[in-house]
């Protein structure tokens, strides 16, 4: 008689999640999405001279436990204080350590085009590669939609970079649209197409490209037909948004019924998101139907405050899942 032994499901890790001040709202959402996440706190203070005065609460209680830190390197001024905590946590006799850095901010500065250029993406990767090991081994570094996938090779062997994507959140939202069967995906350039097209194979596609015309660089449709379609432009990040606006104009001129956009990282320096709000659009032809972003850049999300056409697709559930890897 053959005895079949049922395989027991793998027990989920209990995670103690620390977070920086600006990620508090996202951390609360991560904890709410899973009963395995337990929020911990840090006292973020400064001395009179401006340098950090930091204290990790419950340092003794987390010994032997799995620990994660949710970071946001939104400006150079906050990186030092967070790096100080990130380097301290693995030394508290914890079982494992995971750094969640939803947006890798120097990711677009990865190339040296002439002698003298400084590839700050490599610099930040080297700093993170120096994170001390915990009792469980190397630190896992979770990053969403890093600008160039080859940047995984910038990290040293003492950390384990884990690259996730926000595209499943977009796919879920697209399925909820009333015109879900009329969606076409557009890419603003070949780089975005190479990066994301394999995740979006179920949709017709349009690829745009910048071409030089005299002294100007203008956006043209390289391939695909947007006529009569709800076209969604997909890219990893947005800064000023100039390219997205030019793509929108070209797609509308070629007969797109509606144009929307998705980016994982809404950087928007100097409040450049205001160019996209419906109150600041010149006319209906210049408006995006939807502009989907994630909460990888918390300060931007707070500033936008759900003004149309913006909608926030939270990474919270995805982060909770990534912490179980």
Curated annotation (Swiss-Prot):
Keywords: ATP-binding, Kinase, Magnesium, Metal-binding, Nucleotide biosynthesis, Nucleotide-binding, Transferase. InterPro entries: Pribosyltran_N, PRibTrfase_dom, PRTase-like, Rib-P_diPkinase. The keyword Metal-binding applies. It catalyses: D-ribose 5-phosphate + ATP = 5-phospho-alpha-D-ribose 1-diphosphate + AMP + H(+). Mg(2+) binds at residues 145, 147. This is Ribose-phosphate pyrophosphokinase 4. Its EC number is 2.7.6.1. Binds 1 Mg(2+) ion per subunit. It comes from the Eukaryota. It is an enzyme of class 2 (transferase). The lineage of its organism: Eukaryota, Viridiplantae, Streptophyta, Embryophyta, Tracheophyta. GO terms for molecular function: ATP binding; kinase activity; magnesium ion binding; ribose phosphate diphosphokinase activity. Gene3D superfamilies: 3.40.50.2020. The keyword Transferase applies. Residues 228-243 are annotated as: Binding of phosphoribosylpyrophosphate.
